[in-house]
């Protein structure tokens, strides 16, 4: 019986504990776990994780990575392995937290490669069958001896497929997170039933492009590497690329997926003959990725609000997303939300400088803005067809007292395209957390 280690993370507040599942459904053919190996200095917090395909057949894998020019060593190593293997035969992920192994020169590259080498050896994988990820402080070399010594211990004693194993794994990738982020779901495609499990970390340095944070999806569905890559990229664009906490893009952002086919059924590919099954899987993964991405925003450093920016009736999806992103990243808007101030001028300002595709993408005389409560109560119009409304400040205050809020913008272009973007407010606590990050 492999051991489980009760997760060591900051004491969960009542707010945080709401988002940690008490149970889950998990895909067939995987073993996961996490331990403390010594990267984190407190002597107990979990800081090393492994996800392993145990099905006995090579899995398909896909990845989406940061476009930050200072790509961390593990990002470079994982991208290279994924490309060389064409997404086939990747059977494990190994992750450390507490140190990003970013901007660490030749030694950092060697350390990332050694993590892959040792993981493949102890799991009896062929060479370059593992992807490696790191997260934490930038600019310091890894305590690599502790990590390389921890990998065999984790692999031999602490991997399994119970709920606690998954919680340990999700906790071991955390840094400033206040809770481990884990989501599972079961779904059917035709007569076949499949399961998805996903975990991610992130609370600050969140403003992605191509991917964000660290995130892992695993499924027992049979999917070709090329189909998995296309689905992952599509899903990430509509989830992890549609969130922001503070406008900073990490050097280490990585989202990876693995599909081992352990549940059987017809292989899902991206050919026309498989279009229906492909579309069904894509829809499930998009919904799943959005659930995980939203947990990151809910755990935004110092955040007190979860805000959905919903842009409707844009000329294109690109315009809708760009405008939503512009609002979501506005520090003035985010601080107004923290202060419960219905300052809609900051919303219009962010709409006005958004990077859109044409002069007709935003027409002030057709633009409307409103606050939409999530409890189903009456919305509050702020701007209607370019004309300001007399705002009921008491009603605005009632709405802004809530943790969740939708800000809806209708561009009135008759283009019919829409996009959602998720963000949080910006508080005094955010400054405190990041001012003390290395201390």
From Swiss-Prot:
Its main location: mitochondrion. Keywords: Acyltransferase, Amino-acid biosynthesis, Arginine biosynthesis, Autocatalytic cleavage, Mitochondrion, Multifunctional enzyme, Transferase. One of its GO terms (biological process) is L-arginine biosynthetic process. It is an enzyme of class 2 (transferase). Pathway: Amino-acid biosynthesis; L-arginine biosynthesis; L-ornithine and N-acetyl-L-glutamate from L-glutamate and N(2)-acetyl-L-ornithine (cyclic): step 1/1; Amino-acid biosynthesis; L-arginine biosynthesis; N(2)-acetyl-L-ornithine from L-glutamate: step 1/4. CDD domains: OAT. GO terms for cellular component: mitochondrial matrix. Its EC number is 2.3.1.35, 2.3.1.1. The record marks 135-136 as: Involved in the stabilization of negative charge on the oxyanion by the formation of the oxyanion hole. The keyword Cytoplasm does not apply. Substrate binds at residues 175, 201, 212, 301, 434, 439. GO terms for molecular function: glutamate N-acetyltransferase activity; L-glutamate N-acetyltransferase activity. Catalyzes two activities which are involved in the cyclic version of arginine biosynthesis: the synthesis of acetylglutamate from glutamate and acetyl-CoA, and of ornithine by transacetylation between acetylornithine and glutamate. This protein may be expected to contain an N-terminal transit peptide but none has been predicted. Heterodimer of an alpha and a beta chain. PANTHER family: ARGININE BIOSYNTHESIS BIFUNCTIONAL PROTEIN ARGJ, ARGININE BIOSYNTHESIS BIFUNCTIONAL PROTEIN ARGJ, MITOCHONDRIAL. This is Arginine biosynthesis bifunctional protein ArgJ, mitochondrial.
């Amino acid at each position: 019986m492999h051991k489980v280690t009760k997760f060591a993370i900051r004491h969960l507040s009542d707010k945080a504990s709401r988002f940690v599942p008490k149970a889950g459904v998990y895909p067939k053919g995987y073993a996961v776990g996490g331990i403390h190996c010594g990267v984190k200095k407190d002597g107990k917090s979990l800081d090393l994780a492994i996800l392993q395909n145990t099905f006995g057949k090579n899995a398909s894998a896909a990845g989406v990575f940061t476009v930050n020019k200072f790509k961390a060593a593990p990002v470079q190593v994982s991208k290279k392995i994924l490309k060389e293997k064409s997404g086939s035969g990747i059977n494990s992920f190994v992750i450390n937290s507490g140190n990003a192994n970013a901007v660490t020169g030749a030694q950092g590259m060697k350390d990332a490669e050694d993590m892959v080498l040792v993981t493949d050896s102890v799991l009896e994988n062929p060479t370059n069958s593992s992807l490696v990820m790191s997260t934490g402080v930038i600019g310091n070399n890894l305590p690599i001896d502790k990590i390389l010594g921890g990998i065999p211990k984790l692999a031999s004693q602490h991997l399994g497929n119970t709920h606690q194993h998954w919680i340990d794994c999700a906790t071991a990738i955390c840094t400033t997170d206040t809770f481990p982020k884990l989501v599972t779901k079961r779904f059917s495609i035709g007569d076949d039933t499949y399961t998805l499990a996903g975990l991610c970390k992130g609370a600050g340095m969140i403003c992605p492009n191509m991917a964000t944070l660290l995130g892992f999806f695993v499924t027992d569905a049979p999917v070709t590497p090329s189909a998995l890559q296309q689905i992952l990229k599509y899903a990430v664009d509509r989830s992890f690329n549609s969130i922001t906490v503070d406008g900073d893009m990490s050097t280490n952002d990585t989202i990876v997926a693995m599909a081992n086919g352990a549940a059987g059924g017809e292989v899902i590919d991206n050919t026309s003959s498989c279009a229906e099954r492909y579309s069904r899987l894509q829809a499930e993964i998009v919904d799943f990725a959005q659930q995980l991405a939203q947990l990151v925003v809910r755990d935004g450093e110092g955040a007190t609000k979860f805000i959905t920016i919903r842009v409707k009736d844009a000329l294109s999806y690109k315009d809708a997303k760009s405008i939503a992103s512009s609002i979501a990243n506005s520090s003035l808007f985010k601080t107004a939300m923290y202060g419960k101030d219905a300052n809609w001028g900051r919303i219009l300002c962010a709409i006005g400088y958004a990077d859109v595709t044409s002069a007709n993408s935003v027409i002030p005389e057709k633009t409307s803005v409103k606050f939409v409560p999530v409890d189903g109560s009456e919305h509050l119009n702020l701007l209607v067809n370019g004309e300001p409304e007399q705002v009921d400040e008491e009603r605005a205050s009632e709405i802004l007292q809530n943790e969740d809020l939708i800000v809806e913008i209708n561009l009135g272009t008759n283009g019919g395209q829409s996009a959602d973007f998720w963000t949080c407010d910006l508080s005094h606590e955010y400054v405190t957390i990041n001012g003390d990050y290395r201390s």
